[in-house]
Regions:
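PLP-dependent amino-acid enzyme catalytic core
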Residues: 1-311
């Protein structure tokens, strides 16, 4: 019998899909291989680190039975933590900028989490500061700290990276991933680079907030990447190239994936695929396998400009 005893056991082992229609439409000679992380039970790649960070805190004796998990997040990590907390009997307090989509708020509340909103203009730093303030005044509480927690990239190194390597039979030429905490790129990238030192690693950040590429931060509409500060868990030395993506390009690409590939993916997925397509269009990558991370589902962005479609 193959029956899980906890929703946590359903996290990971997500599928990979080649975007054949997208390749043909855009006359790409490379293979775009998407790691579709919306297949996680909470709908995003962040389910992985939610479980990984909670388990690390439990093993370290920092998270005790009946304890409270507090986390600043742009949304998906909060949803994943709310899900894991519900399954393990913890209280979750999620701190999020009020500029994030209403669907994200509703999902966290549906899992039983308490939601604290901070001013969107303060970005993720405002949420981080508020989370630390709440932790100081809440008994038996911890901030798991995705931006600084080594369990974040370690989880991807232990799970996502090996899955990609196995599913491609080790034939990975390029990895393309957005930078939010940097944990996804760092964990997967370090694993792949160890297996093949020639793997090219491409980071994706907002055109309106090119902090990594130009040292300039600003407001933007690509929810989930571009935290406007450089996270501690990001290993910048792994990055070979940084591609900035405009909001309209991310939105348009996301809509195209839904309409022509049947994959309803989120804003940062659109951004990552657009960036991957720029790499794939280069003659030197003809015939190469370009792995692109699709962090979440588009269902949590239906109220945003991305899917503001006139009937």
């Amino acid at each position: 019998m193959r029956i899980a005893k906890s929703v946590a056991e359903l996290i990971g082992r997500t599928p990979m899909l080649e975007f054949t229609h997208f390749e043909q439409t855009h006359c790409l000679n490379a293979h775009l291989l998407a790691k579709v992380e919306s297949f996680n039970p909470g709908g995003s790649v962040k389910d992985r680190i939610a479980l990984g960070m909670v388990e690390a805190a439990e093993k370290a004796g920092k998270l005790l039975p009946g304890g409270t998990i507090i986390e600043p997040t742009s949304g998906n990590t909060g949803i994943g933590l709310a899900m894991v907390a519900a399954a393990r009997g913890y209280t979750a307090i999620i701190v999020m900028p009020d500029s994030m989509s209403v669907e994200r708020r509703q999902l966290m509340l549906a899992y039983g989490a308490k939601l604290v909103l901070t001013h969107g203009k303060l970005g993720m730093k405002g949420a981080v500061d508020k989370a630390n303030e709440l932790a100081a005044e809440t008994p038996n509480a911890i901030v798991v700290g995705q931006f600084v927690n080594p369990a974040n990239p370690a989880t991807h190194r232990a799970t996502t990276g090996p899955e990609i390597w196995a599913d491609t039979d080790g034939q990975v030429d390029v990895l393309v991933a957005g930078i939010g905490t940097g944990g996804t790129l760092t964990g997967i990238g370090s694993y792949l680079r160890e297996k093949n030192p020639n793997v090219r690693i491409v980071a994706v950040e907002p055109f309106s907030s090119p902090l990594l590429s130009k040292g300039v931060a600003g407001p933007h509409g690509l929810m989930g990447i571009g935290a406007n500060f450089v996270p501690d868990v990001l290993s910048r030395d792994l990055i070979d190239e940084i591609i900035t993506v405009k909001e309209d390009d991310a939105y348009r690409t996301g809509r195209e994936l839904a309409a022509h590939e049947g994959v309803l993916a989120g804003i940062t997925s659109g951004a990552a695929v657009w960036a991957a397509s720029q790499v794939a269009a280069r003659p030197e990558f003809a015939g190469k396998n370009i792995v692109v991370i699709l962090p979440d589902t588009g269902e949590r962005y239906l109220s945003t400009k991305m899917f503001a479609i006139n009937e």
